[in-house]
A protein has these predicted regions:
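A glycine-rich beta-to-alpha transition motif near the start of alpha/beta enzyme domains, typified by
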Residues: 24-182, 189-335
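Short, Lys/Arg-enriched N-terminal segments with co-localized hydrophobic residues
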Residues: 12-24
Length: 335
Protein backbone atom coordinates (compact mmCIF):
# COMPACT_ATOMS: atom_id res chain seq x y z
CA UNK A 1 0.00 0.00 0.00
CA UNK A 2 1.29 3.45 -0.91
CA UNK A 3 2.03 5.74 2.05
CA UNK A 4 2.89 9.43 2.00
CA UNK A 5 4.86 10.57 5.04
CA UNK A 6 4.34 13.93 6.77
CA UNK A 7 6.32 14.34 9.99
CA UNK A 8 4.93 11.91 12.55
CA UNK A 9 1.95 10.98 10.36
CA UNK A 10 1.57 8.57 7.46
CA UNK A 11 -1.26 9.08 4.97
CA UNK A 12 -2.39 5.74 3.60
CA UNK A 13 -3.65 5.28 0.06
CA UNK A 14 -7.22 5.31 1.41
CA UNK A 15 -6.62 8.84 2.74
CA UNK A 16 -6.61 7.89 6.41
CA UNK A 17 -3.88 9.29 8.61
CA UNK A 18 -1.92 7.09 11.00
CA UNK A 19 0.82 7.83 13.49
CA UNK A 20 4.30 6.73 12.38
CA UNK A 21 5.19 6.14 16.04
CA UNK A 22 2.10 3.97 16.57
CA UNK A 23 0.76 2.62 13.26
CA UNK A 24 -2.34 1.24 15.00
CA UNK A 25 -3.36 4.77 16.01
CA UNK A 26 -5.43 6.66 13.45
CA UNK A 27 -5.47 10.49 13.49
CA UNK A 28 -8.20 12.88 12.40
CA UNK A 29 -7.17 16.56 12.24
CA UNK A 30 -9.71 19.16 13.36
CA UNK A 31 -10.22 22.82 14.20
CA UNK A 32 -12.65 23.89 16.91
CA UNK A 33 -14.50 27.18 16.99
CA UNK A 34 -17.53 28.56 18.76
CA UNK A 35 -20.25 30.79 17.38
CA UNK A 36 -22.11 32.62 20.11
CA UNK A 37 -20.96 29.95 22.57
CA UNK A 38 -22.02 26.97 20.43
CA UNK A 39 -19.08 24.79 19.30
CA UNK A 40 -18.28 23.66 15.78
CA UNK A 41 -15.65 21.01 15.11
CA UNK A 42 -14.45 21.19 11.51
CA UNK A 43 -12.99 17.88 10.33
CA UNK A 44 -10.21 18.56 7.83
CA UNK A 45 -9.28 15.03 6.79
CA UNK A 46 -9.16 11.41 7.90
CA UNK A 47 -12.70 10.21 7.22
CA UNK A 48 -13.27 7.35 4.77
CA UNK A 49 -13.61 8.36 1.12
CA UNK A 50 -17.23 9.03 0.10
CA UNK A 51 -17.99 8.18 -3.51
CA UNK A 52 -21.56 9.34 -4.16
CA UNK A 53 -21.79 12.15 -6.77
CA UNK A 54 -24.30 14.09 -4.63
CA UNK A 55 -23.90 15.51 -1.15
CA UNK A 56 -27.17 13.94 0.00
CA UNK A 57 -25.83 10.62 -1.26
CA UNK A 58 -22.61 11.12 0.69
CA UNK A 59 -24.62 11.77 3.85
CA UNK A 60 -26.49 8.51 3.29
CA UNK A 61 -23.19 6.73 2.64
CA UNK A 62 -21.62 8.14 5.79
CA UNK A 63 -24.68 7.26 7.84
CA UNK A 64 -25.03 3.70 6.58
CA UNK A 65 -21.37 2.67 6.38
CA UNK A 66 -19.25 4.93 8.60
CA UNK A 67 -21.56 6.35 11.28
CA UNK A 68 -19.09 5.45 14.03
CA UNK A 69 -16.91 8.33 12.81
CA UNK A 70 -19.72 10.79 13.55
CA UNK A 71 -20.32 9.25 16.97
CA UNK A 72 -16.63 9.50 17.88
CA UNK A 73 -16.15 13.08 16.69
CA UNK A 74 -19.21 14.52 18.46
CA UNK A 75 -19.69 12.22 21.45
CA UNK A 76 -17.96 11.38 24.68
CA UNK A 77 -15.14 10.88 25.46
CA UNK A 78 -13.67 12.94 22.58
CA UNK A 79 -16.28 15.73 22.67
CA UNK A 80 -19.16 17.12 24.67
CA UNK A 81 -22.75 16.35 23.72
CA UNK A 82 -23.29 19.87 22.32
CA UNK A 83 -20.52 19.63 19.71
CA UNK A 84 -21.59 20.02 16.09
CA UNK A 85 -19.29 18.41 13.56
CA UNK A 86 -18.65 19.77 10.08
CA UNK A 87 -16.95 17.42 7.64
CA UNK A 88 -15.12 19.55 5.08
CA UNK A 89 -15.22 18.10 1.56
CA UNK A 90 -14.32 19.37 -1.93
CA UNK A 91 -17.02 21.54 -3.55
CA UNK A 92 -19.66 19.92 -5.72
CA UNK A 93 -21.04 23.08 -7.32
CA UNK A 94 -18.94 25.33 -9.55
CA UNK A 95 -18.06 28.48 -7.62
CA UNK A 96 -18.34 26.92 -4.15
CA UNK A 97 -15.32 26.94 -1.84
CA UNK A 98 -16.25 23.69 -0.08
CA UNK A 99 -18.93 21.14 0.63
CA UNK A 100 -19.95 20.49 4.22
CA UNK A 101 -21.79 17.70 6.00
CA UNK A 102 -23.06 18.75 9.43
CA UNK A 103 -23.75 16.27 12.21
CA UNK A 104 -24.12 16.05 15.98
CA UNK A 105 -24.10 13.45 18.73
CA UNK A 106 -27.25 11.71 17.47
CA UNK A 107 -27.35 12.17 13.70
CA UNK A 108 -27.07 14.44 10.68
CA UNK A 109 -28.24 18.00 10.04
CA UNK A 110 -29.39 19.32 6.69
CA UNK A 111 -27.95 22.72 7.53
CA UNK A 112 -26.46 24.42 10.58
CA UNK A 113 -26.36 28.22 10.79
CA UNK A 114 -23.84 28.62 13.58
CA UNK A 115 -21.83 25.80 11.99
CA UNK A 116 -21.74 27.53 8.60
CA UNK A 117 -20.42 30.67 10.29
CA UNK A 118 -17.80 28.51 12.01
CA UNK A 119 -16.80 26.85 8.73
CA UNK A 120 -16.26 30.19 6.97
CA UNK A 121 -14.23 31.53 9.91
CA UNK A 122 -12.18 28.33 9.89
CA UNK A 123 -11.48 28.60 6.16
CA UNK A 124 -10.23 32.15 6.77
CA UNK A 125 -8.04 30.93 9.64
CA UNK A 126 -6.56 28.30 7.32
CA UNK A 127 -5.82 30.97 4.70
CA UNK A 128 -8.11 29.38 2.12
CA UNK A 129 -10.40 32.42 1.79
CA UNK A 130 -10.29 36.15 2.49
CA UNK A 131 -13.02 38.73 3.07
CA UNK A 132 -15.74 38.71 0.47
CA UNK A 133 -18.66 36.57 -0.66
CA UNK A 134 -18.29 32.80 -0.78
CA UNK A 135 -20.64 29.86 -1.16
CA UNK A 136 -20.63 26.41 0.40
CA UNK A 137 -22.55 23.32 -0.63
CA UNK A 138 -24.76 21.70 2.02
CA UNK A 139 -27.11 18.70 1.77
CA UNK A 140 -30.11 21.06 1.55
CA UNK A 141 -28.64 23.49 -0.97
CA UNK A 142 -26.10 26.22 -1.61
CA UNK A 143 -25.48 28.66 1.24
CA UNK A 144 -23.95 32.04 0.35
CA UNK A 145 -21.70 33.56 3.01
CA UNK A 146 -20.23 37.06 3.27
CA UNK A 147 -17.06 37.31 5.35
CA UNK A 148 -16.70 40.86 6.67
CA UNK A 149 -13.61 42.78 7.71
CA UNK A 150 -14.62 42.73 11.38
CA UNK A 151 -14.61 38.92 11.36
CA UNK A 152 -18.37 38.53 11.30
CA UNK A 153 -20.08 36.29 8.76
CA UNK A 154 -23.48 36.84 7.15
CA UNK A 155 -25.00 33.67 5.74
CA UNK A 156 -27.78 33.75 3.18
CA UNK A 157 -29.55 30.60 4.22
CA UNK A 158 -31.67 28.21 2.20
CA UNK A 159 -35.29 29.38 1.75
CA UNK A 160 -37.39 29.32 4.92
CA UNK A 161 -41.15 29.19 5.36
CA UNK A 162 -43.90 28.67 7.89
CA UNK A 163 -45.62 25.36 7.28
CA UNK A 164 -48.46 25.51 9.85
CA UNK A 165 -49.76 28.26 12.15
CA UNK A 166 -51.27 27.98 15.65
CA UNK A 167 -50.93 24.23 16.11
CA UNK A 168 -52.25 22.94 19.44
CA UNK A 169 -50.36 20.14 21.19
CA UNK A 170 -51.35 18.47 24.47
CA UNK A 171 -48.20 18.31 26.61
CA UNK A 172 -48.22 16.17 29.73
CA UNK A 173 -47.77 18.34 32.81
CA UNK A 174 -48.14 21.59 30.84
CA UNK A 175 -51.57 21.43 29.23
CA UNK A 176 -52.25 22.61 25.69
CA UNK A 177 -49.36 24.39 23.99
CA UNK A 178 -49.88 26.42 20.81
CA UNK A 179 -47.08 27.00 18.33
CA UNK A 180 -45.99 27.26 14.71
CA UNK A 181 -44.19 24.73 12.52
CA UNK A 182 -41.51 26.26 10.30
CA UNK A 183 -38.56 25.24 8.14
CA UNK A 184 -35.30 27.16 8.36
CA UNK A 185 -32.92 24.45 7.14
CA UNK A 186 -34.19 22.13 9.89
CA UNK A 187 -37.74 21.62 11.22
CA UNK A 188 -38.84 23.68 14.22
CA UNK A 189 -41.81 23.97 16.53
CA UNK A 190 -41.82 27.58 17.75
CA UNK A 191 -43.59 28.67 20.94
CA UNK A 192 -43.97 31.92 22.87
CA UNK A 193 -43.01 30.73 26.35
CA UNK A 194 -42.09 33.86 28.30
CA UNK A 195 -44.09 32.68 31.33
CA UNK A 196 -41.40 30.06 31.97
CA UNK A 197 -38.73 32.74 32.49
CA UNK A 198 -35.70 33.34 30.27
CA UNK A 199 -32.73 33.88 32.56
CA UNK A 200 -29.89 31.38 32.71
CA UNK A 201 -31.32 30.16 36.00
CA UNK A 202 -34.39 29.00 34.07
CA UNK A 203 -32.45 26.68 31.74
CA UNK A 204 -33.34 23.45 33.63
CA UNK A 205 -37.06 24.32 33.58
CA UNK A 206 -36.94 25.32 29.91
CA UNK A 207 -35.16 22.06 29.12
CA UNK A 208 -37.87 20.04 30.90
CA UNK A 209 -40.65 21.86 29.06
CA UNK A 210 -38.98 21.66 25.64
CA UNK A 211 -38.27 17.94 25.98
CA UNK A 212 -41.84 17.22 27.07
CA UNK A 213 -43.12 19.26 24.11
CA UNK A 214 -40.95 17.42 21.60
CA UNK A 215 -42.03 14.05 23.00
CA UNK A 216 -45.67 15.16 22.63
CA UNK A 217 -45.07 16.18 19.00
CA UNK A 218 -43.80 12.70 18.25
CA UNK A 219 -46.57 10.88 20.11
CA UNK A 220 -49.31 12.92 18.46
CA UNK A 221 -47.88 12.68 14.96
CA UNK A 222 -47.25 16.41 14.55
CA UNK A 223 -44.70 16.69 11.75
CA UNK A 224 -43.19 18.94 9.15
CA UNK A 225 -43.92 18.69 5.45
CA UNK A 226 -44.22 15.16 4.03
CA UNK A 227 -44.14 13.68 7.52
CA UNK A 228 -40.69 15.04 8.37
CA UNK A 229 -39.74 14.76 12.03
CA UNK A 230 -39.70 18.03 13.99
CA UNK A 231 -36.43 17.58 15.85
CA UNK A 232 -35.92 21.17 17.11
CA UNK A 233 -38.07 23.04 19.63
CA UNK A 234 -37.63 26.82 19.85
CA UNK A 235 -39.00 28.77 22.80
CA UNK A 236 -39.17 32.57 22.92
CA UNK A 237 -39.25 35.14 25.70
CA UNK A 238 -38.36 38.72 26.46
CA UNK A 239 -34.75 39.79 25.75
CA UNK A 240 -32.37 40.86 28.51
CA UNK A 241 -32.20 44.41 27.11
CA UNK A 242 -34.21 46.63 24.80
CA UNK A 243 -31.31 46.51 22.30
CA UNK A 244 -32.57 43.09 21.21
CA UNK A 245 -35.93 41.92 19.91
CA UNK A 246 -36.30 38.51 21.52
CA UNK A 247 -34.52 35.83 23.52
CA UNK A 248 -34.70 32.16 22.59
CA UNK A 249 -34.04 28.71 23.95
CA UNK A 250 -33.51 26.01 21.31
CA UNK A 251 -33.66 22.31 22.10
CA UNK A 252 -31.47 20.44 19.60
CA UNK A 253 -31.95 16.88 18.32
CA UNK A 254 -29.51 15.41 20.84
CA UNK A 255 -31.56 16.89 23.72
CA UNK A 256 -28.97 19.56 24.45
CA UNK A 257 -29.71 23.27 24.12
CA UNK A 258 -28.12 25.63 21.62
CA UNK A 259 -25.82 28.16 23.25
CA UNK A 260 -26.09 30.39 20.18
CA UNK A 261 -29.35 31.96 18.94
CA UNK A 262 -29.40 29.12 16.34
CA UNK A 263 -29.03 30.16 12.70
CA UNK A 264 -31.66 27.81 11.28
CA UNK A 265 -33.93 28.56 14.23
CA UNK A 266 -33.61 32.30 13.68
CA UNK A 267 -34.37 31.68 10.00
CA UNK A 268 -37.55 29.82 10.99
CA UNK A 269 -38.47 32.69 13.33
CA UNK A 270 -38.00 35.22 10.52
CA UNK A 271 -40.31 33.14 8.31
CA UNK A 272 -43.02 33.29 10.98
CA UNK A 273 -42.55 37.03 11.53
CA UNK A 274 -42.79 37.64 7.79
CA UNK A 275 -45.92 35.49 7.50
CA UNK A 276 -47.55 37.47 10.32
CA UNK A 277 -46.53 40.83 8.83
CA UNK A 278 -44.54 41.69 11.98
CA UNK A 279 -41.16 42.28 10.32
CA UNK A 280 -40.64 44.16 7.07
CA UNK A 281 -38.42 42.88 4.30
CA UNK A 282 -34.85 44.07 4.94
CA UNK A 283 -35.50 45.09 8.56
CA UNK A 284 -33.06 43.81 11.20
CA UNK A 285 -34.17 41.36 13.89
CA UNK A 286 -31.74 40.95 16.79
CA UNK A 287 -32.13 37.50 18.26
CA UNK A 288 -30.56 36.87 21.67
CA UNK A 289 -29.73 33.37 22.90
CA UNK A 290 -30.35 32.02 26.37
CA UNK A 291 -26.66 32.67 27.22
CA UNK A 292 -26.72 36.24 25.87
CA UNK A 293 -25.07 35.91 22.45
CA UNK A 294 -26.78 37.63 19.51
CA UNK A 295 -27.42 37.02 15.81
CA UNK A 296 -28.75 39.69 13.47
CA UNK A 297 -31.35 38.44 11.03
CA UNK A 298 -33.14 39.89 8.03
CA UNK A 299 -34.88 38.52 4.97
CA UNK A 300 -35.96 39.15 1.43
CA UNK A 301 -39.17 37.78 0.01
CA UNK A 302 -39.05 34.60 -2.06
CA UNK A 303 -41.61 32.70 -4.11
CA UNK A 304 -42.66 30.30 -1.36
CA UNK A 305 -41.46 32.01 1.79
CA UNK A 306 -38.35 34.06 2.49
CA UNK A 307 -34.60 33.99 1.95
CA UNK A 308 -33.11 34.71 5.38
CA UNK A 309 -29.73 36.25 6.16
CA UNK A 310 -28.12 35.59 9.55
CA UNK A 311 -25.06 37.46 10.79
CA UNK A 312 -22.81 36.38 13.65
CA UNK A 313 -19.19 35.72 14.51
CA UNK A 314 -17.15 32.63 15.26
CA UNK A 315 -13.93 32.45 17.26
CA UNK A 316 -11.20 29.84 16.90
CA UNK A 317 -10.64 27.95 20.14
CA UNK A 318 -8.74 24.76 19.36
CA UNK A 319 -6.67 22.88 16.81
CA UNK A 320 -5.28 19.38 16.84
CA UNK A 321 -5.86 15.75 16.01
CA UNK A 322 -8.27 13.21 17.41
CA UNK A 323 -6.47 9.96 18.21
CA UNK A 324 -7.99 6.54 17.63
CA UNK A 325 -6.19 3.81 19.55
CA UNK A 326 -7.22 0.32 18.46
CA UNK A 327 -6.85 -0.91 22.05
CA UNK A 328 -9.26 1.74 23.38
CA UNK A 329 -12.74 0.23 23.93
CA UNK A 330 -14.23 3.73 23.54
CA UNK A 331 -12.24 4.88 20.51
CA UNK A 332 -15.54 5.23 18.59
CA UNK A 333 -17.42 6.79 21.48
CA UNK A 334 -19.52 5.56 24.37
CA UNK A 335 -22.40 3.95 22.51
Amino acid sequence: MCRIRHGFVEINQDGRRRSRQNPDMQKIPFIDSHTGGEPTRVILDGFPALTSPTLAGRVAELQSQHDHYRAAVCGEPKASEITVGALLLPPITAGSVASVIFFNNVGYLGMCGHGAIGVIATLQYLGRITTGVHQIDTPVGIVTCALHGDGSVAIENVPAYRYRHNVDVAVEGFGTVCGDIAWGGNWFFLVDANEHGFGREHIPALMTFARALREALGRQGVTGKDGAEIDHVELFGKPSTSEYDSRNFVLCPGSEYDRSPCGTGTSAKLACLAADGKLAEGAIWRQESIVGSVFEGSYRNAANGITPTIRGRAFMCGEGSLLFDSSDPFQWGIR
